Structure formats: structure tokens, C-alpha cells
């Protein structure tokens, strides 16, 4: 991948964010997601690359576009694998709540873990704690390590956890250490990445979320130098979700075996989930969030706020783009 391709990757998430944002606050989460998918795919297919969706909207028979295995791009140029979530936090977008964004991870061919549509236990932490905290340790132990690595008392730490019934015991354990809980309803990618930046007020992400988004988070944290680990969750009793009401632990283990995953309890490091030589993360806000603003529609332009993290040149770029309308008369600087 070269710098010109990274610019086009930025434009992919910008277009998806703009499309979704047209329905922000209108209670239409499926429609907002569909618009983002269409816009993302359209921009991808204009790029000179041999792109492939390795994590997308589902299996081929479940999703009409951006399905797993779909080829995107013109068919010329470099081979690029994509993990995409065109509208992460569809509920957040639908009800104009904070934290919805269009996101993707890109790498050279074979550089991203083909995560099954399962759940994943996740641990994200700042670079200072990389390799010191561990997902196999208790929350209490990890908070003690974080406190030492960051030079903060436990009661000065903020831990992000998704607001789910399955996290009741985890939340109680975290609070017992004195640390603060920041619950989120959806969209843990932005929370994971925020752990990699000082000054966000987010020090750690713990708990269980979707596995595909875990790969996207891992790509960002690998490029950023932060800590990320993931472990697949296959037991419905642990996932505690209505989506798995008809599934069994044994059936899920069989599904993983059929996918070639021989060690279902393996702990994956960021460098294993995003193992490519070149790894790029790109995200663009749909609604305002922790790292960047959402889409702003103005009389003469549309503004997007985005983040691109690349290990190719070890850069993080926060970008505000002004998309000018035809016949624009006056563009405000901010």
C-alpha cells in the first residue's frame, strides 16, 4: 500500500459516514446501515486495487453487499484485505447518540484475522501497559498493573465496559477496586482506540463484544502501539445474548473447528489479529464521539472528522474535510 491508497481509504469511510448521517436521529438503523454499506462499496470499487472483504456484513447468503469474500476495487493494483463496519453503532446513529462511526481496517493480503461472527472477550490499554496487563488476569490484577504503569491511583482510572447483563460481575469487581466505570451501550471500537491516546480520560476497555470489531480495534492498536488482546467466546451461557438463544456450546465449537480454529480458547495478540506487514485503520465520525466529531451538514458544505492510523510511516492523522457543494458561496473555517 502507498500513501495515495491511504488517502482513498480515508475517502471510503468519509463517504460511508456522510451517507449514514443523513438518517441520524430518525430511528432508522437498518436504513442508515444500508446507506453506509452502499456508499462504502461504491467508493471501494473506484479504487485501483484487488480488494477483498474478509470481515463485513455477513456471509454471502446473508448480505447483498460487502459480504465476506466479496471482491472490491477495479481488479488492478495491490491486493488489499478489508475488515469493515460501515456504520458501527447503528442504534447510536438511529437515535443521534454519541459514538457512531464508519470504520475499517486494511492490510496486505492475508494480513487480517478472518474472525467468525462470534463474540470476543477484549482488553485494550495504553502503550505504557502493553505486555504488562493480560486478558488472562483478573480485572483487579489488571487495574493494579494499570495504576502502576500510568502513575494513577485506581480511583483515577476510567474503565469502559459495554452495558450488558453479562458484565454484572465484571462491573462489580472493577468498582470494588475504586476505579470508575464508563458504560457504553454500543460501539466499542472507538473506546478501545481511545485507550491508545493520552488525555482522552479512557484508560482501559474490558469485557465482551463482537469479534469482527475486535479485529478492527486490534489493527488500530497495533499501528498505534497500544495493548489489545482478544479471546473468542463460544459459550452462550457466557455471551448471554438473545441472538444465541438457539445455539449450544458444542455447536459453536463445531463451527469453529469447521473454520479451522483448532484452539478455541487461544488468546490473540493485536499482532496476530492484524498480522500484515502494512496495517491501516480509518474511521470517520457519524455522530460526535470521544475522538472526533460527527458529520456536520451546512448550507454550502458537509464536514467530516476522521482518524487514520498507519504503521507504514507510524502516523496518526486527525482530518477535517470540507466537502464543498456546487455553487458554494461562503465556507466557514470552523
Swiss-Prot record:
Database matches in InterPro entries: FBPase_class-2/SBPase
Keywords: Calvin cycle, Carbohydrate metabolism, Hydrolase, Manganese, Metal-binding
Enzyme class: hydrolase
Entry's EC annotation: 3.1.3.11, 3.1.3.37
Pathway: Carbohydrate biosynthesis; Calvin cycle
Listed GO CC annotations: cytosol
Name the record gives this protein: D-fructose 1,6-bisphosphatase class 2/sedoheptulose 1,7-bisphosphatase
Amino acid at each position: 500500500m502507498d500513501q495515495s491508497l491511504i488517502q482513498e481509504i480515508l475517502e471510503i469511510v468519509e463517504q460511508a459516514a456522510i451517507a449514514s448521517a443523513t438518517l441520524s436521529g430518525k430511528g432508522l438503523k437498518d436504513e442508515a446501515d444500508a446507506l453506509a454499506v452502499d456508499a462504502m462499496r461504491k467508493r471501494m470499487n473506484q479504487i485501483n486495487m484487488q480488494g477483498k472483504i474478509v470481515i463485513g456484513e455477513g456471509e454471502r447468503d446473508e448480505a447483498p453487499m460487502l459480504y465476506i469474500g466479496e471482491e472490491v476495487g477495479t481488479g488492478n493494483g495491490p491486493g488489499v484485505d478489508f475488515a469493515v463496519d460501515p456504520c458501527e453503532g447503528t442504534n447510536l446513529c438511529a437515535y443521534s447518540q454519541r459514538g457512531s462511526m464508519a470504520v475499517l481496517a486494511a492490510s496486505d493480503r492475508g494480513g487480517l484475522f478472518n474472525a467468525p461472527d462470534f463474540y470476543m472477550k477484549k482488553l485494550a490499554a495504553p502503550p505504557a501497559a502493553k505486555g504488562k496487563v493480560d486478558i488472562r488476569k483478573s480485572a483487579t490484577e489488571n487495574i493494579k498493573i494499570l495504576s502502576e504503569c500510568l502513575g494513577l491511583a485506581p480511583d483515577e482510572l476510567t474503565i469502559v465496559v459495554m452495558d450488558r447483563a453479562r458484565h454484572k460481575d465484571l462491573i462489580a469487581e472493577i468498582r470494588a477496586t475504586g476505579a470508575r466505570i464508563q458504560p457504553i451501550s454500543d460501539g466499542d471500537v472507538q473506546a478501545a482506540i481511545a485507550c491508545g491516546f493520552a488525555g482522552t480520560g479512557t484508560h482501559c476497555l474490558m469485557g465482551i463484544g463482537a469479534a469482527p470489531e475486535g479485529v478492527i480495534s486490534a489493527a488500530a492498536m497495533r499501528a498505534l502501539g497500544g495493548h489489545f488482546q482478544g479471546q473468542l467466546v463460544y459459550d452462550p451461557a457466557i455471551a448471554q445474548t438473545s441472538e444465541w438463544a438457539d445455539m449450544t456450546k458444542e455447536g459453536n465449537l463445531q463451527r469453529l473447528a469447521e473454520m479451522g480454529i483448532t484452539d478455541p480458547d487461544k488468546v490473540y495478540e493485536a499482532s496476530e489479529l492484524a498480522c500484515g506487514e502494512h496495517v491501516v485503520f480509518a474511521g470517520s465520525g457519524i455522530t460526535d464521539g470521544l475522538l472526533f466529531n460527527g458529520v456536520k451538514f451546512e448550507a454550502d458544505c458537509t464536514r467530516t472528522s476522521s482518524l487514520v492510523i498507519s504503521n507504514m510511516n507510524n502516523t496518526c492523522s486527525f482530518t477535517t474535510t470540507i466537502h464543498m457543494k456546487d455553487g458554494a458561496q461562503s465556507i466557514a473555517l470552523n
